[in-house]
């Protein structure tokens, strides 16, 4: 089953957590969830050139805190912070809560599955060979420090009449192992022959402790250049 389900959804509350981190009453839940979807869609369209990986939305009391993880923060911030103020005003129109906007830089985009998938899709839209784009993404990830990566592309590859699926893998990608820290993302390439789907799995190691925040903490430490914390072995204490 590990190969059939979404790797992130399978690991929620094990070593991953949600991108929308708030609780609401039943009468308000639908409206707030719709706000999240609209804000995420707007951010990805507005900052398409900034390399946005994910958008974390938290809702403390009567506030809305939006954190954008991007590979090019300067594109969003703009000269003297002019662009980020414009973005904040546009996002404020989606919610009635007080909006706070934070920008987090991704210093190793080669290890981010969303950015790798979008990079491969953009290369195919520029008519780069899909095999070359896949191999380049895999080699860059392994060179930076990934323990394994798998890339799937599906569609009318190379303009073929019949759609097919091809994949490329290097290293280990243990999808059945719940403690495995696996980043997963999808993207689409719009070509003259139709849409080509891209899927990327990146294996970064194992998280032995049961902590939903472990992936985010490990990711932030890796981006800052600090050594990851050693895993806590609860069984050895017993």
From Swiss-Prot:
One of the GO BP terms on file: translation
Gene3D superfamilies, per database record: 3.30.300.20, Ribosomal protein S3, C-terminal domain
Sample GO molecular function, one term: mRNA binding
GO cellular component: cytosolic small ribosomal subunit
A Pfam match: KH_2
UniProt xrefs under SMART domains: KH
Annotated ranges, domain KH type-2: 39-107
Span list, region Disordered: 212-238
InterPro entries to which the protein is assigned, alphabetical: KH_dom, KH_dom-like_a/b, KH_dom_type_2, KH_sf_prok-type, Ribosomal_S3_C_sf, Ribosomal_uS3_bac-typ, Ribosomal_uS3_C, Ribosomal_uS3_CS
Keywords assigned by UniProt, alphabetized: Ribonucleoprotein, Ribosomal protein, RNA-binding, rRNA-binding
PROSITE patterns recorded: KH_TYPE_2, RIBOSOMAL_S3
Ranges of Basic and acidic residues composition bias in the record: 212-222
Family per similarity comment: Belongs to the universal ribosomal protein uS3 family.
Subunit structure: Part of the 30S ribosomal subunit. Forms a tight complex with proteins S10 and S14.
Function (record text): Binds the lower part of the 30S subunit head. Binds mRNA in the 70S ribosome, positioning it for translation.
Name the record gives this protein: Small ribosomal subunit protein uS3
Organism (species): Cereibacter sphaeroides (strain ATCC 17025 / ATH 2.4.3) (Rhodobacter sphaeroides)
Upper taxonomic lineage: Bacteria, Pseudomonadati, Pseudomonadota, Alphaproteobacteria, Rhodobacterales
Underlying gene: rpsC
């Amino acid at each position: 089953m590990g190969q059939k389900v979404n790797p992130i959804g399978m690991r929620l509350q094990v070593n991953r957590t949600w991108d929308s981190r708030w609780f609401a009453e039943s009468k308000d839940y639908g409206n707030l969830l719709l706000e999240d979807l609209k804000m995420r869609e707007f951010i990805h369209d507005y900052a398409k050139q900034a390399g946005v990986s994910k958008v974390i939305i938290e809702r403390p009391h009567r506030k809305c805190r939006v954190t954008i993880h991007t590979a090019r923060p300067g594109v969003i911030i703009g000269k003297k912070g002019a662009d980020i103020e414009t973005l904040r005003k546009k996002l404020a129109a989606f919610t009635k809560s007080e909006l706070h906007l934070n920008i987090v830089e991704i210093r190793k985009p080669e290890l981010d599955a969303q950015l790798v998938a979008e990079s491969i899709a953009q290369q195919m839209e520029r008519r780069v060979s899909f095999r070359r784009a896949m191999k380049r993404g895999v080699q860059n990830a392994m060179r930076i420090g990934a323990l394994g990566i798998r890339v799937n592309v599906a569609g009318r590859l190379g303009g073929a009449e019949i759609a097919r699926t091809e994949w490329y893998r290097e290293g280990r990608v243990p999808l059945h192992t719940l403690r495995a820290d696996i980043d997963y993302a999808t993207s689409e390439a719009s070509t003259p022959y139709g849409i080509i789907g891209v899927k990327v799995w990146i294996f970064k190691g194992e998280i032995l402790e049961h902590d939903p925040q472990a992936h985010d903490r490990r990711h932030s430490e890796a981006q800052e250049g600090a050594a990851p914390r050693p895993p806590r072995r609860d069984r050895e204490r017993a």
